[in-house]
Amino acid sequence: MKKVLALILALCMAFALAVPAYAADDEEVSGPLVLYSSMTEFDLEALETCFNEVYPDVEIEVVSGSVGEYTSRIAAEADNPQGDVTWGGLCDSDGMTHEALFEKWVSIHNDEAMEGYSTPNGFYSMDHLSTVCFCVNTELEEELGLDIRSYEDLLNPALKGKIVISDPNSSSAAWNNLCNIFSVYGVGTDESWDYISKLLENMVVVEKSSVCFNSVYDGEYVVGLTYEDGAIKLNQNGSTTTEVRYPTEGTSAAAYGMAIVKNCPHRAAAEALVNFMTSAEGQTAIAEYEEGTLRLTNANYVVPEGAWLEASADMTWVPRPVNELIERKAELLEHWNELVGQIQG
């Protein structure tokens, strides 16, 4: 990582000199910026480093938390907003759920997004994709004599209490995983609920999405139902005991975005940050910094050589019925909660 840092910073500097301003009306941007985020520390480091090469006078304060935590906070602060912008957690399957919290504004680069990944609602600016995966502790897997590749493999009795997922009521990563199960087995079908019921017999539900890969690395669980950009960073940081695997039945991705808090105190800086993160230049800089551990949305960004994530062309994908999932989200979560109560008490 360190050996490429100088090159990456030089790249960011080059963008600072070569690309047009990202702020509204090309105004000079400086001062504080409060970012509510569910992204990993490394994602935040990448964004802050590359953005500050373009806007060195913006001081970013990060408030970390799940999407449920920070949307509740924004709602509570509505009469006196403290935050400016969000990153992570807000996904295309939210529909208009959070309409009251955010400005009706999207990035100037919205039209540059890959097909299907422009704004879904007029206030999210989509910047990255999060693909459903398993994070597997290969040492524990070997001890159990298993080869975990599919959803059906997760039902093995040897995995009882050894699979972890976060709470889909507050974690977008967990909802993303449920959406993929529904994409494979049918949205709200008897087959899907039968599978989920059996899976809950083996699974532990936790609050924070990062637990679903960090605790697998720590050896607390064998499998985490999680997202690739979080899990792959374990390998990037030297893990030899965890692997990112995609269910053989097929995987799918949710598009995640940024949004500007309604009546935020630092609007110009917020717009500059969103415009930077959704631009081809900004995404290329982020991708270089992160060594290709995040799938991004701008059709023109450059994927770095030797990227950590598996190439999309080599993966098995399943279509995701996004609109149906949006329409039925409340109903599906209600049934999920009922099953959790019945099976796990």
Regions flagged by a language model, labelled:
Residues V34-E45, G65-G68, Q82-E220:
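Extracytoplasmic ligand-binding site segments that recognize negatively charged/polar headgroups
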Residues S252, Y256, V261-R320:
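Mature extracytoplasmic/periplasmic domains
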Residues E112, S130, Y195-L199, V205-V206, ...:
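Periplasmic-binding protein-like
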Residues A24-V85:
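Conserved N-terminal structural module of periplasmic/extracytoplasmic solute-binding proteins
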Residues D92-T97, Y217, V222-T241:
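A ligand-binding cleft/hinge motif common to bilobed small-molecule-binding domains
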Residues M1-P32, Q344-G345:
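Short, low-complexity disordered leader/linker segments with a strong preference
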Residues T316-G345:
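Conserved C-terminal helix/tail region of periplasmic/extracytoplasmic solute-binding proteins
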Residues I74, S215-G219, I260:
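Hydrophobic residues within well-ordered alpha-helices
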